[in-house]
Amino acid sequence: MGGLAWGPSRAAGSSWVNASGTWEQPLRGFSGLQGGRRRGRGEKGIPEEPLCQLTPQLGLSLRVPFGLGDYGLDMPGPQPSAASQTTGAVACLAEVLLWVGGSVVVSPRWQLSLVVERCMSAMQEGTQMVKLRGSSKGLVRFYYLDEHRSCLRWRPSRKNEKAKISIDSIQEVSEGRQSEIFQRYPDSSFDPNCCFSIYHGSHRESLDLVSPSSEEARTWVTGLRYLMAGISDEDSLARRQRTRDQWLKQTFDEADKNGDGSLSISEVLQLLHKLNVNLPRQRVKQMFREADTDDHQGTLGFEEFCAFYKMMSTRRDLYLLMLTYSNHKDHLDASDLQRFLEVEQKMNGVTLESCQNIIEQFEPCLENKSKGMLGIDGFTNYTRSPAGDIFNPEHNRVHQDMTQPLSHYFITSSHNTYLVGDQLMSQSRVDMYAWVLQAGCRCVEVDCWDGPDGEPIVHHGYTLTSKILFKDVIETINKYAFIKNEYPVILSIENHCSVVQQKKMAQYLTDILGDKLDLSSVSSEDATMLPSPQMLKGKILVKGKKLPANISEDAEEGEVSDEDSADEMEDDCKLLNGDASTNRKRVENIAKKKLDSLIKESKIRDCEDPNDFSVSTLSPSGKLGRKAEAKKGQSKVEEDVEAGEDSGVSRQNSRLFMSSFSKRKKKGSKIKKVASVEEGDETLDSPGSQSRGTARQKKTMKLSRALSDLVKYTKSVGTHDVEIEVVSSWQVSSFSETKAHQILQQKPTQYLRFNQHQLSRIYPSSYRVDSSNYNPQPFWNAGCQMVALNYQSEGRMLQLNRAKFSANGDCGYVLKPQCMCQGVFNPNSEDPLPGQLKKQLALRIISGQQLPKPRDSVLGDRGEIIDPFVEVEVIGLPVDCSKEQTRVVDDNGFNPMWEETLVFTVHMPEIALVRFLVWDHDPIGRDFIGQRTLAFSSIMPGYRHVYLEGMEEASIFVHVAVSDISGKVKQTLGLKGLFLRGTKPGSLDSHAAGQPLPRPSVSQRLLRRTASAPTKSQKPSRKGFPELALGTQDAGSEGAADDVAPSSPNPALEAPTQERSGSSSPRDTRLFPLQRPISPLCSLEPIAEEPALGPGLPLQAAAPTGPSQEGSQCPVGLGAKVTSSQQTSLGAFGTLQLRIGGGRENEEPPLRPHNGGISSGPREGTSGRQTDSKSRSRVPGHLPVVRRAKSEGQVLSELSPTPAVYSDATGTDRLWQRLEPGSHRDSVSSSSSMSSNDTVIDLSLPSLGLCRSRESIPGVSLGRLTSRPCLASAARPDLPPVTKSKSNPNLRVAGGLPTAPDELQPRPLAPRLTGHHPRPPWHHLTLVGLRDCPVSAKSKSLGDLTADDFAPSFQGSTSSLSCGLGSLGVAHQVLEPGIRRDALTEQLRWLTGFQQAGDITSPTSLGPAGDGSVGGPSFLRRSSSRSQSRVRAIASRARQAQERQQRLRGQDSRGPPEEERGTPEGACSVGHEGCVDVPMPAKGAPEQVCGAADGQLLLRL
């Protein structure tokens, strides 16, 4: 019998035989060849017999080198016929040479085209084969490889075009009768040589086929393995392009309903509906005519369809981004690309040569490529490539330190690895071990029990699961353990066998695993410490019980404690074999009905995965009662079954499945209890049972010496007190999820210290009979290494697990943070790591691409176009858990635009995960579309694509900015959170670390869905913008003693600040101090709204809607002076408030200055305009909102001579200058040059400004910064422009802008005001009154407070209060005479009572235009459904808060009281260290908005 084996090394010039019988260069990695007879040792190594001339009896066997496992591809020879002999020989040779661990590299001279083409041609022609199913009858189907060689298809099938298996999804192709399906058939049913199985998909489903002949079976196995090998060798860029090409072809074929090879206009329209494209029919027809180039025949061929798809999918967001960095050219040159990569993508060491290589690689246009230019197509290709993916490509390989002790790593672990389904009746399969090991799992579980014929078996004890041989399991583990990586595998043995079969187990382990068990070569410097993964490469560690040291070495066995036996079901859930086997069918039928009832009920709830079912933890509270009932005696099984149908089938009693199941078993069959006996209980029919009232008996078991000696570093021990310091690190403690959660809640710091020195394993509760998974994150927070999950249950928890371990090349080991390995902290604390810098993650969700319809859509592709929104969740420490979502975009799943920023604060980013979810909004809930979960440490900064997991083209485009922050962070929860401080939805506290919550009723869930889903036409409230608060700034801060600000000319304004300056009460919280001077406020405002740009459309500057005043309109200036004794220099620290300005829907919006000033002029031209989000998405000229976080400098008073100085948005030394309004600044970036103390987040495009030293800034000695003026037109001759530099790379040189001068010229912010009323002091400001709620608000159902529950009341025209969250000010209003309302209540009503016309996305935009007439066109009030009782509760709480404030401060209140819960989301605030003057505008004058720094009076609630 000839064979292929590894022989001695060959000389460099040696050769091998090729397919034609001549010798060529060998494959890399092979060191020798033995085939037929042993080859000669001549000069050219020519054998006596060519390898291709195989005898019919010849078989081949491949032994793979160490680290790749032993494939043992034993292939029997072909039949004697000459034709089949040649075909079989070629197939065998190709298989042997090509399938080496799924990857092969061939010499250029090696000619395999003939072999490959023969296999591919045969597969594409197709073969009729029998598909085996679980039933006894197979299905005859015709299987073939598609023309693109990307999918295996078959017919006939009811699935039509969905009847396919992608080559990418195939995990393994195995020959013979190896699958579980084949085992159900008698051995004589099929010829093993004609059988093979294809394992595919995330659940490792098997397709079991029987071919007509062994040659055809071998051809299919060879061809599929070849395709899989090519895919594994394919780089990520080529794979992405191939996937896209295949997707386009597949989409074209599916759209071609009549099969004529072209698409008509009707077929194109149907395809667009399927792709969730909502375009006007005329626009579609126009693009159709432009793409139809072959004499305009009215149809599109494939090439024409590709052109049509390209026109349709041109990315506007990428085009605007390209214009930004190309100086508004339609291409990027190498220098532009270099600047983009350095500034936005935060890449280091970018050279012009590397940029030129990118252009060569991604630019499809030959003309552009020859000129060294990257056009929009090339730029799109680059951003959609792996280089533009959000996942760090460095994390695709092992990059962490692997030399630390094992206890310093998280280790991915599997629970009941052998099961394919639930814990009661599912199948046990050997290939589950192959799947999880290849998926990166490093700890697998084997439940061993005594089997027939002296052979130990593996199955879930006391259940109806099927059984497999222990020997087969060990052989599979040996074969697949180190295919993906060589880091150690931990074999968790749950031993329930007798001593005799334990010896058999030890023999199999030793014989099969061999050297993999030999740990003598592993030496550790410290005997008390565990070895490292690097030292244990290629080793298998047996985790199990070990005989104590006091037992004689000659003893063959001994007794050990069985208390630590993990994963056993509760006593009342055990069904032993024996007499119960006669009633197996009856019990199985009952169990199936119960499980079906549970699964049907679980489908009702919101579910990210339709296959992700969950059965809540079943309370064992009735345990004693059930046991007592079981003692009443036995009765007939038939009677019990009939009596039990009524009690258990109903939905309300379905949760009692375990108890009723236990009851039936105990009554209807001989159920034995094992050794554990609870006090006062009696076992049934069990010899040696305890008498009533005896204490709990300690469980012991006998252990074989041979099996004990295989355990070294991973000795299983019983659970003990985590406060006791462990003596040895060579042991593993197992905790159920319930016990571990209890310890985590009671002793978190001790548990963390415990896990620093030894291993701990967490396993699911025994009540998770449906194999559902718990949340692993709380146990990772405590440093638990092996958090075992049910790999067969795909869903959220497994997605978190995959994301966790993808951060280190999927090797199964992830290094813990340093603080978890040394020292202790409380992971449940609100500030677990005080004094350490935190990370702030700013995610701007820009757009989506090719989002499909939900998988479980009733109408499928014919369903309505989706209304998507994005939800982002941060999962980590409890204090870090939060969840935010964007608004809903109506009727657009192809290219929706969100342009919204979500901000998260993370205390420990090393263990945090970030989860992106896309939902389809539905009137009664939401439908899951897709998700992508990543480790925080794996996220790349800059503009990135987030590809949804398991989807070919679906992605969302985001911008990522990560910055360091310090100080105490509190997430603002909005107006709702001000009064209802419940647990955050994303926090771990909300679900008790994975413990199921009581299930709400259907009506409650429907109400929750309706209330929680974001409104289609309104942006959801943002809760992610943090309020960063610190205590009082140290009086000795830098510069505090050098420069003193001049005293305020208004003593009345100084008093409040001086009074607060020494306060240290919890209410006197300050927004975090900056180490560099910035202006007091930082907010997000729309900067420019631009029309859609095409290649032929120049950028147009937006024009103001109102008349200008001397060429510009600017906000009224105020004298905002820093008078705090603690902060009196240039370093005086203002408050930072992040605020979202709602995007306007008007086509010609008023201009906004960069400093947040309000564009003035009458609003009659725009007040009546309103469009909802649906109509906006259909208007080609829709103007997207471009937001920037900017420092809004303090505005000078009219008498101040201080020159204007423009501060940088990032708090650095750069200066701001305003570009012309149409220029695009669409980015979120965090300056890498910021120091660790820079706590300002730059939510803008690359900063536009000149780098200037502080000394050169005019007016620095006065200790104040002023905001820059606004522009109504780009033609202001008095403004010095900014030149293009590295700090402002996106500046374009426009026609009217001269070169920037060397110095900035001082100029006033606004003309002097005349004719207005004197400014009242802060504590004498008149508060504005509102009418009582209308009748329509009194019949509202309970729910959250919205911005529409109150109607405004406008009276008077003299005095006004300017306060607001949006860009409009409040008109002149006074209280109704004779009505006195408390201040805080009125402010709350004012903040929640209005909506700005034309801005349907902002619920808190305040203030009418012009004369402020009641019910003017500038305001909208939408009807909603809320309860009047909530209004009264809010007002009562407001009054109580005010009374508390008055008691603390006395009756002389100087302003609205502060609510100790902090500022509501979206509200503005005034820093305690500064005061403002509020000028009163003249009657009849254009609206002027006054306030602190932003032209607004900012109220802190």
From Swiss-Prot:
One of its GO terms (cellular component) is plasma membrane. Residues 400-545 form the PI-PLC X-box domain. Residues 243-278, 279-315 form the EF-hand domain. The active site is at H415, H459. One of its GO terms (biological process) is phosphatidylinositol metabolic process. The keyword Electron transport does not apply. It catalyses: a 1,2-diacyl-sn-glycero-3-phospho-(1D-myo-inositol-4,5-bisphosphate) + H2O = 1D-myo-inositol 1,4,5-trisphosphate + a 1,2-diacyl-sn-glycerol + H(+). Specifically detected in the brain, with higher level in cerebral cortex, olfactory bulb and hippocampus (at protein level). Expressed in the pyramidal cells of the hippocampus, but also in eye and lung. Activity is stimulated by GNB1:GNG2. It is an enzyme of class 3 (hydrolase). Residues 121-229 form the PH domain. Keywords: Calcium, Cell membrane, Cytoplasm, Hydrolase, Lipid degradation, Lipid metabolism, Membrane, Metal-binding, Phosphoprotein, Repeat, Transducer. Residues 28-47, 551-570, 609-700, 986-1073, 1089-1238, 1273-1305, 1398-1469 are annotated as: Disordered. Residues 707-821 form the PI-PLC Y-box domain. Residues 626-638, 1142-1151, 1215-1227, 1440-1463 have a biased composition (Basic and acidic residues). Its EC number is 3.1.4.11. Coiled coil: none annotated. Ca(2+) 4 binds at D920, H921, D922. Ca(2+) 2 binds at N416, E445, D447, E494. Its cofactor is Ca(2+). Residues 1089-1107, 1421-1439 have a biased composition (Low complexity). The modification Phosphoserine is found at S561, S565, S676, S686. The keyword Zinc does not apply. PANTHER family: 1-PHOSPHATIDYLINOSITOL 4,5-BISPHOSPHATE PHOSPHODIESTERASE ETA-2, PHOSPHOINOSITIDE-SPECIFIC PHOSPHOLIPASE C FAMILY PROTEIN. This is 1-phosphatidylinositol 4,5-bisphosphate phosphodiesterase eta-2.
